[in-house]
């Protein structure tokens, strides 16, 4: 009997294992949480997954970031740089076109002399050719030079004598010299006028006296101060002992050394009345 029961129990175990493996292969749901695929790898799925499958459009709840002052400055700088680059390229193309059509004359080579006619009208060139053939027919064809005006010395600049240490009798002249004390006789008033202007800008509602009147007042105050009698009494600085004689110490209740203002009422025990 025992052998029959053991065989039945083993057969039951094998059947349950086969059933469980068959369920896993078919993809059965266990406890509403585990789903197995054909391979046998389990995946855990949320119970309320259907509520999260469709994501809401959250862009409507956010505002776009505003550009800062630095970003605006950099963007404007890029625009200006690109515009200047385009203008420079356009100028280069125009210059190349002009130089190709009208090459400049060169005095080194003979071939470039013929290109000078592109810069001047035919009438002017005919006049130049006639004048050159009449006076100097053998010379090459060149345009006349512009008349140069001589640089005349301005009469406003004075001339100072120059005395050399080697030869004191030599007579030379120069337009400059070192300044001496005799050149600075007037008092400088630039700083005073500048200070008055700044004061007028800062306080436009006030009226300021002229500079010469203020100078007169200062001179008068200096004279009055000098005329005052000066006392010859020798004064000494106050000491702590002399201060304690006139102002006695006042004791007040409290815990700390400096009282810290904890006393609700200051009770003066000793006081002297100074008449």
UniProtKB/Swiss-Prot annotation:
Region (Disordered): 1-28
Source taxonomy: Eukaryota, Metazoa, Chordata, Craniata, Vertebrata
Taxonomy, superkingdom: Eukaryota
Polar residues composition-biased segments: 1-20
UniProt-recorded name of the protein: Testis-specific gene 13 protein
PANTHER family: TESTIS-SPECIFIC GENE 13 PROTEIN (PTHR37352:SF1)
Alphabetical list of InterPro entries matching this protein: TSGA13 (IPR029241)
Source organism per UniProt: Homo sapiens (Human)
Tissue: Testis-specific.
Originating gene: TSGA13
Pfam family, one: TSGA13
